[in-house]
């Protein structure tokens, strides 16, 4: 069995970064501070696929300002100073150490561009567990048009590079992109994880093979199947 991890959501907690970008996008507006969403309110909306435009409306902005705020967040969310807000989930190192001890092949496939990924690898010292060949991402400067298609290409590239069989590989992701692209690439199992940018309820609609809350549950399920 081989394991493929999406990055943001399963491995990286991006909620602080997205919330900081939300707050930044409201600066200069004349809205009442009491209308600004708490992080919990904001993240619940994000997880349930409420658009950035709608979130701005809920925060008291008018239509035009909401459009500007939503557009600004597309850039703000990926600026270096905001990427610093990212956190590694507590169970990641322990999970990677376990997989290495069991000699289980695992790798990361993400729609981050190379520069953003390199920043995170250095920030969280992930090169202790994975070499450069185990990260698959988007080239700097490349504009992603179709998330599912782009991720599918990366998933197939990983199979080819490692000479792995898709049916023996499981993908762990937190979005519809991960689930649909995993199925398109004919990965053996598709696991939805509910701590990322989609809620448990949203993931249930997609009918993944398994739905988990954390990586410990992934290990438990995979160990049970392997045995």
What are these regions (language model features)?
Residues 87-91, 112, 174, 195-198, ...:
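Short beta->alpha linker loops
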Residues 114-169, 180, 184, 202:
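Substrate-recognition "cap/lid" segment bordering the active-site pocket of phosphatases
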Residues 136-137, 210-214:
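Short acidic-hydrophobic, aromatic-tinged amphipathic segments that line or gate anion-handling sites
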Residues 63, 104, 208:
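Short phosphate-binding/catalytic loops that engage adenosine nucleotides
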Residues 1-90:
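N-terminal helical cap/lid subdomain that shapes the substrate entry/recognition surface
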Residues 80-108, 114-118, 152:
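Short, acidic loop-to-helix structural element flanking the phosphoryl-transfer center
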Residues 170-210:
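Acidic, Mg2+-coordinating phosphoryl-transfer loop and its flanking beta/alpha structural elements
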Residues 10, 17, 114, 177, ...:
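Conserved Rossmann-like nucleotide-cofactor binding loop
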């Amino acid at each position: 069995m081989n394991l493929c991890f999406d990055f943001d959501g399963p491995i990286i907690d991006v909620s602080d970064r997205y919330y900081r970008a939300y707050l930044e996008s409201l600066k200069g507006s004349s809205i009442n501070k009491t209308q600004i969403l708490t992080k919990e309110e904001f993240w619940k909306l994000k997880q349930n696929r409420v658009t950035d435009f709608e979130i701005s409306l809920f925060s008291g902005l008018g239509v035009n300002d909401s459009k500007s705020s939503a557009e600004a967040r597309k850039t703000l969310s990926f600026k270096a100073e905001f990427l610093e807000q990212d956190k590694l989930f507590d169970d990641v190192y322990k999970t990677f150490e376990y997989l290495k001890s069991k000699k289980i092949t695992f790798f990361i496939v993400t729609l981050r561009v190379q520069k953003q990924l390199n920043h995170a690898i250095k920030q969280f010292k992930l090169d202790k567990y994975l070499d450069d060949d185990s990260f698959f991402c988007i080239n700097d400067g490349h504009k992603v048009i179709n998330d599912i298609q782009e991720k599918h290409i990366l998933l197939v590239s990983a199979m080819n590079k490692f000479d792995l069989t898709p049916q023996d590989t499981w993908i762990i992701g937190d979005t519809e992109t991960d689930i649909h692209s995993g199925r398109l690439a004919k990965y053996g199992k598709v696991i939805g994880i509910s701590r990322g940018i989609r809620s448990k309820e949203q993931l249930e609609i997609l009918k993944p093979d398994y739905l988990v809350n954390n990586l410990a549950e992934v290990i438990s399920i995979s160990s049970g199947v392997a045995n």
